[in-house]
Structure formats: structure tokens, C-alpha cells
Amino acid sequence: MHALQAKILDPRIGNEFPLPQYATPGSAGLDLRAMLKEDTLLEPGQTLLIPTGLSVYIGDPGLAALILPRSGLGHKHGIVLGNLVGLIDSDYQGELMVSCWNRGQTAFNIAVGERIAQLVLVPVVQAHFEVVEAFDESQRGAGGFGHSGSH
């Protein structure tokens, strides 16, 4: 397990609401909460940047964090991330913000403290480019979209 440094930017975290935590021993994501000043109605088609009240510092360049949607919000209510996935670099130290987009047909109320996204730590391998004239042959080659069949 990796120790993740965190700064609490909203005093309600740790008092009214717990620090992000894993829901079960097998959970991959830590739940992030909407640390809004008041409940907010997200209209259909609207995107809103929501503070989490928390900043983190990963510190290890071999790791990054992803902010991902919560499956229930997307499936049941059409609430997904406006940027689809948020990437948190290992040297970022600012507040974690969640871009929420209502792709549904009805307005959705985001309550103060509601779990709106999840944070997942992932390994990172940094690459450098090696410029070549040609690639070694592979079975796929340059086959792109639909190369393996229609269904």
C-alpha cells in the first residue's frame, strides 16, 4: 500500500464527512465527495467543476491517480465526468476538482458531501522516443478501426 499525502482544504472533511476511503477490501477506488457550499442542481447538458476539499501529493513518479466516474451515477442518472477521466500527475499538489456533466434528460441534485467520483492510483511507465525508419513486422501491422471484424 502506498502512503498518499493529503491536505484537508475543507474543514468538514474529517468532521461531517470522512476522509476518502475504500468501500470494501477489494475496492480499487477511493470515493471523492462534492464539497459544495450548498446543494446544487445540475441541469441536462450542464457541466460543473466541483471541489473535493482535498489536495493530494503522490510524490512517486512511478504512480499517477485517475479520477473516474461512479458507475451508479452514470448508469442511473446520466452523471459522468466532463473530461471523461481526470489525470493527476505525481507532482501535482492542488485541490482535486471533479468536472461533472449531466448527459441525462433530467436535472440532478448534487448534495453537499455526496460521493461523486472515485480516485484510483495507477502505475506509470515513462517512455522516451526512439526514432526508427521502419518497425519490426507484427501480425496486426497498421490495421486500425474494425481491422479484426465487424462484430
UniProtKB/Swiss-Prot annotation:
Pathway: Pyrimidine metabolism; dUMP biosynthesis; dUMP from dCTP (dUTP route): step 2/2. Its cofactor is Mg(2+). Gene3D superfamilies: 2.70.40.10. SUPFAM superfamilies: dUTPase-like. It catalyses: dUTP + H2O = dUMP + diphosphate + H(+). GO terms for molecular function: dUTP diphosphatase activity; magnesium ion binding. It comes from the Bacteria. This enzyme is involved in nucleotide metabolism: it produces dUMP, the immediate precursor of thymidine nucleotides and it decreases the intracellular concentration of dUTP so that uracil cannot be incorporated into DNA. PANTHER family: DEOXYURIDINE 5'-TRIPHOSPHATE NUCLEOTIDOHYDROLASE. This is Deoxyuridine 5'-triphosphate nucleotidohydrolase. The gene is dut.
